[in-house]
Amino acid sequence: MNRKVILLCLIFLVPKDSLQIGKKECIVDLQKTTCFQHPESDLFEKAVVCIKKYEGWHSLKHFPYVGYGHRLLKEEAFDHRISEKFADSILRKDLRLKCELFRDFGSDSLILGTLAYNVGEYRLLGFGKKQKSTLIRKLEKGNRKIYDDYIAFCHYKGKVVPSIKKRRMEEYRLLFNCKNINNKSYDKCR
């Protein structure tokens, strides 16, 4: 009986969340996300600021999106009338979850998580008949020349959207480190 109580206490001490990818549910330990050892690091903060800048505030007309682009889930009991502080905490939680999906990419998990926050992880990782993106395939092979592939995520209905292209360029500039990855130095990443 004491073991059950201790186990329950341990479960509640470690913040966890879950997300569904296709039909699989992933349990994520938010303290072990690999965006960075300290998720409130400078780069994580830059990502949050960048997302806020380009997402803007989502009001009732943006339903089912609230705050800074959070998509409401069926079980969530709030709407667009949330505080900025609450929206900030949701953004950070969502970004950590996205980063966790890309944990195998090490320090690139932040830029990939930031992109997935906007376009969805399926566009990067593939799902069903949709293949992995060229961006992911290049990074898996160790190819750091991903600028064009990253910026290419700026289309809507087949057309380049200048504001989204500007966003991608800023995200890349702020968050992608092409040098000294895995003890290798890369002179050019474009």
Task: State what each model feature region is.
Residues 2, 7-57, 70-75, 82-101, ...:
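Long, amphipathic alpha-helical surface segments
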Residues 46, 61-63, 107:
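Extracytoplasmic
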Residues 62-63, 76-79:
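Short, glycine/acidic-enriched capping/hinge loops at junctions between secondary-structure elements
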